[in-house]
Amino acid sequence: KMRDAIRCVGHKGTMPTMEFLFRLDQTVNMHGEKTTELVLRKVADKVAARAGLDLVDFSVYPNVDHHPARYEYLFEFYHADHAAIDLAELSRITDEELRAGNYDVSYMTEDGTFAPAIARVLQDETNQLWRDMRVMHGKAPNQIKPVHIVDTEQKRRFFFALIDGEIEG
């Protein structure tokens, strides 16, 4: 009933050890566009593939404080040369893939309801640090879900503090 996507990461005897990947029915809905987490994931995977980077994980911040509102992708890449990443090009690809993934977002960007999506790059190990902090606060490691939608101020402060300032545009 929880609608979580899980992956078996091992066994303890005959009992499988599960890792939560994401909640299946989480959505971003700033202006009625209803972008699902599955669409957000597909966009992240396509952006990484097009940029030739290995994606560790991603988060999306639906920034309603920016005028007009916009999607802000926070990417963590595996052993990427951050100095070689063209942030403007990464943002362009991200916006293009998001528009292709959700036609409402495309239409609303064209009519000015949304600003084009942007991309930011997180420091290495950001997502592991989030997991470690949750464990330190008493959460069971196998119950911690990756943060794909930044939906609280605590998550926003954490992830935005770990944006790689060397390539910030």
Language model: regions and residue ranges:
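AMP-binding adenylation
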Residues: K1-G169
